[in-house]
UniProtKB/Swiss-Prot annotation:
Gene3D superfamilies: Aldehyde Dehydrogenase, Chain A, domain 1, Aldehyde Dehydrogenase, Chain A, domain 2
Protein keywords: Amino-acid biosynthesis, Cytoplasm, NADP, Oxidoreductase, Proline biosynthesis
Keyword Cytoplasm on entry: yes
Protein family: Belongs to the gamma-glutamyl phosphate reductase family.
Function: Catalyzes the NADPH-dependent reduction of L-glutamate 5-phosphate into L-glutamate 5-semialdehyde and phosphate. The product spontaneously undergoes cyclization to form 1-pyrroline-5-carboxylate.
Name of the protein this chain belongs to: Gamma-glutamyl phosphate reductase
EC number: 1.2.1.41
Pathway per the UniProt entry: Amino-acid biosynthesis; L-proline biosynthesis; L-glutamate 5-semialdehyde from L-glutamate: step 2/2
Catalytic reactions on record: L-glutamate 5-semialdehyde + phosphate + NADP(+) = L-glutamyl 5-phosphate + NADPH + H(+)
Localisation per UniProt entry: Cytoplasm
Enzyme class: oxidoreductase
Gene Ontology biological process terms, A to Z: L-proline biosynthetic process
Amino acid sequence: MPVLNLKSGFADADDLDTLMAGIGRRARAAGRAMALAPAQTKDLALRAIAEQIRASAATILRENARDVSAAQAAGQTKAIIDRLTLDEGRVAAIAEAVEKVASLPDPVGRQLAAFERPNGLLIERISVPLGVVGVIFESRPNVTADAGALCLKAGNAAILRAGSDSHRTATAIAAAMSEGLARTGLPADAIQLVPTRDRAAVGLMLTGLGGCVDVIVPRGGRSLVERVQAEAKVPVFAHLDGICHVYIAEGADLGMARTVLLNSKMRRTGICGAAETLLVDAAVAKTHLKPLVEALLESGCAVRGDAATQGVDPRVTPADEADWRTEYLDAIISAKVVDGLDAAIAHIEANGSHHTDAIITDDTEAAARFLNEVDSAIVTHNASTQFADGGEFGFGAEIGIATGRMHARGPVGVEQLTTFKYRVHGSGQTRP
């Protein structure tokens, strides 16, 4: 199976430094061309990529089965296996996500602001591509297509480094993307998959490849993200943990609370938007706590709770302090009764990860306070935490979720993969 850049020859390179430096230089050159690519050409390429992914489904699934088998033999967790596994529906969803990106408005060249100075200068702020985006991911093979498509749409070049778990699948998807690029005449190096499993390649990407990489996006476990944040010499869009809360406040409808809670926790337990902690307001604990805990247990979710939660069902096991700061990524949730909105917000501030947190209530004033005061990238009112997703936000797809405060926050889609420049129009003005 060829790597994404079929003509590069990088797969035969003996010297990793030379290999990665070459990838960086080629990406930088491709990025300059991509920044000027017409919107129509980019969209044609994306649609061709989606078509080729569908045509290559059998190959992608065959390679994915090999990856899954190897991961199972290596004793990987159920959560990792779930993120790694593709089926016909998931491959179709990957292609559809690429098409959705194609249908989005072009984020490049938009006038973000315009104003005139007293001296007659006309100043515009215009959106432009970031340049070269490095994406380092582990067990999510769909990131290959999502990241490549988003970078392409935003006029960037992408360097993709797949983890060992998903390398075969990523290579198969990458080959399909290469075909789409070739059909439309865009640079073959606009999207490159690093053709090695050598982990030292990650370290080289984090240096910026001699000024060729403008931003790094890690998609993977805590150890990967910690390493990237600690070692990167370029800006990073990332989140460390997804410790998401569902707070059942006073005024919550029990039926809605049950439905939203179960979706937040159990729809997919291994994603970063899955709820990890249930907070129930003391004002509704008598009516809501027991049925909510029973619903979780009956759905196959283990519950670790405080004394009040343990008291409603003998199957609840004690929670310790570490549980409030644990991203389980499994069918496990911690649960606690809190004394009012202030206590809920304080608990989230002390133990959360600034990712996604939800309040369930019909009290609009309480909801407004929660949405305003909880310092997370995404806060929801009467909606599942699992809406923390670029596709659900209408972004077509996402390259990741960012919880930092610089530039991108929340789902990172095409708009977040641009920056801006100022265009200054004069008529001969000079500065006194």
